[in-house]
Structure formats: structure tokens, C-alpha cells
């Protein structure tokens, strides 16, 4: 195979790979806890896995809490594991209105200046001083995925949600690249409802890097 033919073949294969569906994950409200906060809310209770998530090593735990805000509460909010360095609560805009909390749109881990909330478990309660956010929609990628899609960590792209009658394009979708990540787009329940992404046939495709 000559060089030109090889380059043409590789280019064609990469184009096909860029057009492949991106798995879509709908993130319901959930919490991440530090080891210290977990021990206070679930004293003597080892964290236990209920369901593995697509991202390696991550899982939904059996443990749940109630979120209590100035105007309302949300029960049975799932803990995601493993435990983190800092506690964090991720909710939708609809959840924020229910709770009466002005949660800002942030990337996971960007918690400076965020509001707090009360967490109640079957064993104890804990007032977080900060950590409540509405998560920025994003796509997890491995370095190889990023190379194929020609994007880099921190880029913003436009993504189409397809496979249903309510095709919708989301702009400002953040790219998150890490060696331990698998290709998956994360949106919250408000975004999923708007896009009709509750359909099992729904998937994401990259429209254009921005």
C-alpha cells in the first residue's frame, strides 16, 4: 500500500470514528462525600456498591440522604462512590427551585463560592457550608478519544442528541479528558427531558468543536 492510499484510508477510518454515537448518561441528583463527612453521616457503616457506572471504578452506592434547603427537601438522593477529597452535591435547576437554593452552573470540583445545604442520613445530619452545584454538561474522553475527535481537555463543543423525535443541539458542552475515562456524555434530568433523552435509543453525536 502506497503512502497516499494509506493516508486516505486512515483519514476515512478516522472520519467514520468521529461520526460514531457517543453513549449518553443522564445524571439524576446525587452527592459525593469526603471520608470525613461520610463517617459522620454513616458512622460504622462501610460504603457499599449498588450498581457500577460506566466510568471505571465509579458506582452508585446503597447509601442515600435527604437534602434539606430553605424551601423544601429531596429524599433518597444517591451517594456516588468512591469517596472524594471534598463533598459535593449535584442537582438540576428544577431541584434547586424545589430546595430554594441558588446553585451555580459549574464543572465538578469547582466549588468556590457555592451554597451549602443540610444532609440527613438515617443516622445523623450534617450542614455543608458549600458544595451545591448544577453540573455543566460534559463529555468524558480518553486521550485516544480526544485525538480521534480532534479536541482537548477544557474545549467546548456542540453536541446533537439524536435517536428520538426531539432532536436537540446542546452548545457549550465541556470536554473532560483523562486516561481513566471512557467515552460518555453526561447531562442532567432537565436537559434529558428537553431532549427526549429518556428514550433508550437516544445517543449523542459531536456536531462541531467550538
UniProtKB/Swiss-Prot annotation:
It is found in: Bacterial microcompartment. Its cofactor is Zn(2+). GO terms for molecular function: acyltransferase activity, transferring groups other than amino-acyl groups; metal ion binding. It is an enzyme of class 2 (transferase). CoA binds at residues 26-28, 71, 78, 193. Phosphate binds at residue 84. Pathway: Polyol metabolism; 1,2-propanediol degradation. This is Phosphate propanoyltransferase.
Amino acid at each position: 500500500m502506497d503512502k497516499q492510499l494509506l493516508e486516505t484510508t486512515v483519514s476515512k477510518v478516522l472520519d467514520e470514528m468521529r461520526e460514531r454515537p457517543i453513549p449518553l448518561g443522564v445524571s439524576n441528583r446525587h452527592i459525593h462525600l469526603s471520608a470525613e463527612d461520610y463517617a459522620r453521616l454513616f458512622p460504622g457503616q462501610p460504603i457499599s456498591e449498588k450498581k457500577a457506572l460506566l466510568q471505571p471504578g465509579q458506582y452508585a452506592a446503597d447509601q442515600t440522604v435527604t437534602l434539606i434547603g430553605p424551601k423544601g427537601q429531596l429524599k433518597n438522593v444517591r451517594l456516588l462512590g468512591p469517596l472524594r477529597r471534598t463533598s459535593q452535591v449535584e442537582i438540576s435547576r428544577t431541584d434547586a427551585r424545589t430546595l430554594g437554593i441558588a446553585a451555580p452552573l459549574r464543572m465538578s470540583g469547582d466549588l468556590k463560592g457555592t451554597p451549602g445545604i443540610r444532609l440527613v442520613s438515617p443516622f445523623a445530619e450534617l450542614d455543608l457550608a458549600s458544595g451545591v452545584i448544577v453540573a455543566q454538561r460534559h463529555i468524558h474522553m480518553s486521550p485516544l478519544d480526544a485525538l480521534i475527535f480532534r479536541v482537548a481537555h477544557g474545549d467546548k463543543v456542540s453536541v446533537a442528541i439524536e435517536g428520538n423525535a426531539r432532536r436537540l443541539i446542546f452548545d457549550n458542552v465541556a470536554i473532560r479528558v483523562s486516561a481513566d475515562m471512557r467515552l460518555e456524555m453526561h447531562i442532567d434530568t432537565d436537559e434529558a427531558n428537553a431532549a427526549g433523552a429518556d428514550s433508550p435509543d437516544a445517543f449523542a453525536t459531536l456536531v462541531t468543536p467550538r
